A protein has these predicted regions:
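Accessible peptide chain termini
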Residues: 1-2, 155
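Sec-dependent signal peptide recognition
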Residues: 2-9
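C-terminal motif of bacterial Sec signal peptides marking the signal peptidase cleavage site
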Residues: 13-16
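Predominantly soluble domains enriched in secretory-pathway, periplasmic, or organellar proteins
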Residues: 18-384
Length: 384
């Protein structure tokens, strides 16, 4: 495995609604793992020093396109999906050495893991947002990594909608949640014990959708991207929406949505809307407060449409706590939060930076360059 290392100059840029950058740049001891789709690499960023190591992702000839990373801090592994070559790779968290890969095919996208059972769940998607080309799928893979040198696909769950992308697991590890990027349907999969058959419950995410009774029909309206389980009965979902096409009226615009769902009854509790240019993308739950943080991808034709937002979900009600926008942000993609809940890390797929923010206010601390046209995607952070 080839490992590259280079120093990065930290740029202090003017940002946000108040055009203010915090001068608090020291003492952040987190390491952020960033898949660089455009370079077939994973960047390992020391946030405090601004130094970046890179690992080449070369599981197959041609493009691999590393897309999303999750970290198992208990068993000390990290995993990456490659949407072009169809692999999931497992690495040692302490040495960053490759341990094993498993071929799942059909454009593996997002992941959720159960650290206690050493099971990894992987969504397999179809092309979306012009980011890649690949196969249509309706499959969620379960990967057993209890023996990490010999990972294997231990189960498959099939939903009735195409392009499953967003994926989350509840705190008990008993249920996984899946959203279709093209059909606007949400699924709850009750994970089977032993040889039992899984139970799958599906609901449409928009009661006005033309496919309310036909989950296999693609409507491309809400275009949900990611979901996060914030407790054992609540799920927060991002819907990128934006420009959509209607057979009768032609092009239309739909505001970006954040939805709050009750996963026991599978009912929609509340919705917050942004403007149609916002494109809510990845989302992460605060480890200390009843808050979720959202990367707003934005529209490249509209400066200051990309940003970051904090939403509260107390009393089963969504409310925007703060929003931060800047012309320096382009196509924000991945987002994660430090274990103490104090700092946010956001990747810019378009601007090529890792942005660091104060989680309580949205003030930007600094930005770290990830190279030339890296197309940074779904990130994960760990305290080392």
């Amino acid at each position: 495995m080839k490992k590259l290392h280079f120093g990065v100059l930290i740029s202090m840029m003017i940002v946000s609604c108040g055009d203010f950058v915090s001068n608090d740049t020291d003492g952040i001891s987190d390491t952020v793992y960033v898949p660089l789709q455009g370079l077939d690499q994973v960047a390992i960023v020391d946030v405090d020093s601004g130094e970046v190591d890179t690992i080449n992702i070369d599981y197959s000839q041609g493009s691999n396109t590393p897309h999303f990373i999750v970290i198992d801090e208990i068993n000390r592994y990290w995993f990456v999906t490659t949407i072009s070559s169809g692999y999931v790779g497992c690495y040692n968290l302490d040495t960053d050495e490759l341990i094993d890969t498993v071929l799942v095919g059909d454009s593996p996208a997002l992941m959720a893991l159960n650290e206690s059972s050493a099971k990894l769940y992987v969504s397999r998607m179809m092309p979306m947002g012009g980011m890649m080309t690949g196969a249509v799928s309706t499959i969620i893979n379960e990967i057993d990594y209890s023996n990490p040198v010999d990972m294997f696909s231990s189960n498959e769950f099939e939903v009735s909608s195409p392009a499953p992308h967003g994926l989350a697991i509840n705190q008990e590890g008993s249920e996984i949640y899946v959203i279709s990027n093209t059909a606007d349907w949400l699924y709850k999969i009750i994970i089977p014990e032993n040889e039992e058959t899984e139970q799958i419950v599906g609901v449409v995410m928009d009661v006005n959708s033309p496919n309310i009774e036909f989950s296999n029909i693609e409507v491309d309206r809400l275009k949900p991207i990611q979901c996060v389980s914030v407790n054992n009965s609540l799920l927060v979902v991002t819907c990128s929406a934006g420009i959509t096409y209607d057979l009768y009226s032609g092009n239309d615009t739909i505001p970006g949505h954040i939805q709050l769902w009750d996963t026991v009854t599978m009912t929609l509790l509340d919705t917050v809307q942004f403007n149609w240019k916002s494109k809510p993308w990845h989302i992460i739950n605060s480890p200390v407060n009843e808050e979720a943080f959202v990367a707003l991808s934005g529209d490249n034709l509209y400066p200051r449409s990309a940003g970051v937002a904090c939403l509260t979900y107390a009393s089963d009600t969504l409310a925007i706590n703060w929003e931060t926008y800047s012309e320096d942000f382009e196509a924000l993609h991945g987002i994660d939060v430090s274990a103490d809940g104090k700092n946010l890390f956001v990747s810019g797929r378009g601007d090529g930076n890792l942005h660091i923010f104060h989680a309580d206010s949205g003030e930007k601390i600094k930005s770290i360059s990830l190279g030339h046209n890296p197309s940074a995607a779904g990130i994960s952070t760990v305290y080392k």
